[in-house]
């Protein structure tokens, strides 16, 4: 079943942390793994960050979270940036350049799927499809996401939901295709 996440859904942090670690982002060189997970917990429990429980949808079966996604509208971006740069970063003593991801991954007016993650033991069971289907049912007229150019499998999934490549962006250390659905 799909539902909005709560602050108590700490399993999301395991998947989010694993995903971010796989991207080898610069912030991982700045803080210990323990501090990194403290940061993730802090921002997940917040109401303002892009990785807040408020922007998270989970897919759950028999009380276990099998996957999740984070999505939000462009109009929330200033609040998210403000929270990171003026709150989270100072709380953890991070440098002025410290970020998890840059904030230029989306374009004005978009409802953006930031992260879709399915736990390894639940892959190939339709969990990603259910999460993506829920996202595409949004009433927003412009939906977007980014997919690594090397991730052919994910691209195929997104194309099956009628996402089309709009442009290219550079995130972390890799090139991504910015894909959209215009309703």
Place the predicted regions along the sequence by residue.
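A short beta-loop-alpha structural element at the N-terminal edge
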Residues: 1-16, 26-30
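Conserved GNAT-fold acetyl-CoA-binding loop/helix
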Residues: 22-44, 89-93
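Active-site rim helix/loop that mediates acceptor-substrate recognition in acyltransferases
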Residues: 34-56, 61
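Conserved beta-strand in the GNAT
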Residues: 58, 64-73, 112, 117
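Conserved acyl-donor/pantetheine-binding loop and adjacent beta-alpha core of acyl/acetyltransferases
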Residues: 73-111, 115
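Conserved GNAT acetyl-CoA-binding A-motif
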Residues: 109-111, 132, 138-149
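Conserved acetyl-CoA pyrophosphate-binding loop and the N-cap/start of the following alpha-helix
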Residues: 122, 126-134
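C-terminal "cap" of GNAT-fold acetyltransferases
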Residues: 141-155, 161, 167-183
């Amino acid at each position: 079943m799909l539902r909005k996440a709560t602050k108590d859904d700490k399993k999301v942090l395991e998947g989010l942390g694993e995903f971010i670690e796989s991207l080898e982002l610069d912030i991982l060189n700045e803080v210990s793994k323990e501090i990194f997970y403290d940061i993730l917990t802090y921002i997940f429990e917040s109401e303002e960050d892009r990785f807040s429980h408020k922007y998270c949808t989970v897919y759950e079966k028999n009380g276990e979270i099998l996957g999740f996604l984070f999505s939000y509208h462009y109009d929330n971006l200033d609040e998210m940036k403000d929270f990171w740069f003026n709150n989270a970063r100072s709380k953890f003593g991070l440098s002025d350049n410290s970020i998890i991801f840059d904030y230029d991954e989306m374009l004005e007016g978009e409802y953006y799927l930031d992260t879709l993650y399915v736990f390894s033991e639940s892959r190939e069971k339709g969990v990603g499809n259910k999460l993506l289907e829920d996202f595409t049912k949004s009433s927003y007229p412009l939906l977007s996401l980014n997919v690594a150019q090397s991730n052919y499998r994910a691209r195929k999934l997104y194309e099956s939901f009628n996402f089309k490549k709009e442009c290219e962006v550079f995130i972390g250390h890799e090139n991504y295709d910015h894909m959209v659905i215009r309703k």
